[in-house]
Curated annotation (Swiss-Prot):
Alphabetical list of NCBIfam families matching this protein: leuB
Pathway given in the UniProt record: Amino-acid biosynthesis; L-leucine biosynthesis; L-leucine from 3-methyl-2-oxobutanoate: step 3/4
Organism of provenance: Pseudomonas syringae pv. syringae (strain B728a)
Name listed for the protein in its UniProt record: 3-isopropylmalate dehydrogenase
Keyword match tRNA-binding: no
Required cofactor(s): Mg(2+); Mn(2+)
Length: 360
């Protein structure tokens, strides 16, 4: 029986980078006889233009029925002035929450070929390999009440709520510990327990879960210190587990240690490892349509999909090796280009990865 993959290119550079990722996926499908069947739909701004909402009900049902979802990126200035509740990003939040995709895996890996692209000294970032495990469906992005009210003095006041339940914390903590077990058996839980009640509960529950993982060395760090340590000495980290807001910020920060957010994939998983896979970067409307976007994060998201949702390790490894071989050849999109390397566009980079994968 074929496995169903739903392709959601999205907005901005999304369709361009997705075209290249799909080429790689289709070759892997053929080369390794994976039995994937691909279907396409719209999300975000493209869905607003077509359906009037950022995520149509029929698209959500397709996503539920699929074995995995591959997403490009959503959003753009065209939709920035519409009502907040129907902006493109709301489609992304809705699909995550409706599919129960509570666990976000965001690796920050520095490819040795790109050491000179990092803003930090090579000796600080060489060999960097961090996995950030971010809680994705709770916290301040989903908390209620939220809104804007008018105070007695006529001034407007905006407010949000940052709630976390024990079960929400426990399940993401388990993902963090499980990830640590297959990596370096080291886990850093990041919170703000000196100020926030939600973080105090977070730390308490993480300590409880730690009792089931005696082999894992657990540490705690306040988020402000973690942000500083990621720049000062990033290689002290192996796996980081944190909440939705902190994970959003820290994973973007960690991405720049690697030279370009255009290199970094992500996975969002439910309790059964069914997932949605997408690049860490946004829709980059400023370069959309120019054919210069880096498709490697989306291509590497395909690799994560094969690894985490389907346990197809050989095919996942082959895609990652193909990307590494292309970098060995000095082929670069503009965001990771340096003197003496070959600058190419989106399609050429995708073609290079396809050629490398075909020859493996």
């Amino acid at each position: 029986m074929s496995k169903q993959i739903l392709i959601l290119p999205g907005d901005g550079i999304g369709p361009e980078i997705m075209t290249e990722a799909v080429k790689v996926l289709e070759l892997a499908n053929e080369k390794y006889q994976l039995g994937f069947e691909l279907t396409h739909d719209v999300i975000g701004g493209a869905a607003i233009d077509k359906h009037g909402v950022p995520l149509a009900d029929e698209t959500l049902e397709r996503a539920r029925a699929a074995d995995a979802v591959l997403l490009g990126a959503v959003g753009g200035p065209k939709w920035d002035t519409i009502e907040r509740d129907i902006r493109p990003e709301r489609g992304l939040l809705k699909i995550r929450s409706q599919l129960g995709l509570f666990g976000n895996l965001r690796p920050a890996i520095l490819y040795p070929q790109l050491a000179d692209a990092s803003s930090l000294k090579p000796e600080i970032v060489a060999g960097l390999d961090i996995m950030i495990v971010r809680e994705l469906t709770g916290g301040i992005y989903f908390g209620a009440p939220r809104g804007t009210r008018v105070l007695d003095n006529g001034e407007r006041q905006a407010y949000d709520t940052l709630p976390y339940s024990e079960s929400e914390i426990r399940r993401i903590a388990k993902v963090g510990f499980d990830m640590a077990m297959v990596r370096g058996k080291k886990l850093c839980s990041v919170d703000k327990a000196n100020v926030l009640a939600s973080s105090q509960l977070w730390r308490e529950i993480v300590e409880q879960v730690a009792r089931d993982y005696p082999e894992v060395e657990l540490s705690h760090m306040y988020v402000d210190n973690a942000a500083m340590q990621l720049v000062r000495a990033p290689k002290q980290f192996d796996v980081i587990v944190t909440d939705n807001l902190f994970g959003d910020i820290l994973s973007d920060q960690a991405s720049m240690l690697t030279g370009s957010i255009g290199m970094l994939p992500s996975a969002s998983l439910d309790t059964a490892n069914k997932g949605m896979y997408e690049p860490c970067h946004g829709s980059a409307p400023d370069i959309a349509g120019k054919g210069i976007a880096n498709p490697l994060a989306t291509i590497l998201s395909v690799s994560m999909m094969l690894r985490y949702s389907f346990n197809l390790t050989d095919a996942a490894d082959a895609i990652e090796k193909a990307v590494s071989l292309v970098l060995d050849q000095g082929i670069r999109t503009g965001d990771i280009w340096s003197e003496g390397k070959v600058k190419v566009g989106t399609q050429e980079m995708g073609d290079a990865v396809v050629a490398a994968l075909r020859n493996l």
